[in-house]
């Protein structure tokens, strides 16, 4: 297996222009494909997940052109639901941001489409979404294991009253919300359980509004969506920088700054993961907010005990930053780490122990006490981009770290290690 050894980093300083947000890129691509008119997306993320969405749109007959660097995309909207001529199979890798929204969108009208992906995708639950779509009339068959992909979709979604469990993944609700305006009837979506990752729902609602569709949000408990609507192209749309990707550079500055400034997001960003900067500030770093940037300057870091349900992806970065904080850090209410690219609670606990931390892994929390000195370790990444990026922070000590399968960052940030090197000074 390929590996990358990072030598100790004495200091980080500089500016990082963030690649486009994965969450925003894939939502915007699908809405542009469903909309009337031509949409130009700029600062689109070029990554594995986005390529899976683009390949699916190609197979569904959507026409678009990409710039040479794949960050500008002109899409000719379909002006309504997407249809396949005859039976079709779409391979979506391990891209949850493609699998869930497409599973819903392709239940409109009449289709016969199979959605499948990598082995890990077949372990990521989708039953709550399928249950909700079936309540709205969709015909969906599990081809292997009940409640997991691959799925066969045969259309039939008309709207009506649907319930969806909000406690596992906000992507199920996102998929229903994006699909509902194009259904023939009104849809009322009721949330069962506590809704996780609410800020990701705000991204969805924000984008739907940009594409001309308003819905009624009743305190995140119930959503009322009028049927028979259509999405309208906004013309040109700039994809925000990826706030989750910003977390690694901001954390690096908190540990070994200097000052690092990330551009492409700012105080008015729609992504909930910008709140990660508040956590670093609470730990002792200095944060400065602009309209299109966030900067972080080193401080003495102290441990925290916090509910991280609002920033589950960026919270992973706090787990490795905790290695540099005084005291024991506890991250709570993060059960949904277990249903991501890998079981992130298990993976994080296992790898933190390798570098010498004392770790308690609970059902939905993790407690981390750093060692006096970090151990050298080979870090397994579990084909999870965030594991690779989080553990790069270990090099901000006086100990090198080896990252196995470093190219797994291609899921969201193909040149992550080059960008980290650019702002780093060797010890």
Curated annotation (Swiss-Prot):
UniProt-listed Enzyme Commission number(s): 2.5.1.19
Residues engaged in binding 3-phosphoshikimate: 22-23, 27, 169-171, 197, 313, 336, 340
Pathway: Metabolic intermediate biosynthesis; chorismate biosynthesis; chorismate from D-erythrose 4-phosphate and phosphoenolpyruvate: step 6/7
Keywords assigned by UniProt, alphabetized: Amino-acid biosynthesis, Aromatic amino acid biosynthesis, Cytoplasm, Transferase
MF terms (GO), sorted A to Z: 3-phosphoshikimate 1-carboxyvinyltransferase activity
Transferase in keyword set: yes
Chief location category: cytoplasm
EC category name: transferase
Stated family: Belongs to the EPSP synthase family.
This protein's name: 3-phosphoshikimate 1-carboxyvinyltransferase
Species: Shigella sonnei
Organism classification: Bacteria, Pseudomonadati, Pseudomonadota, Gammaproteobacteria, Enterobacterales
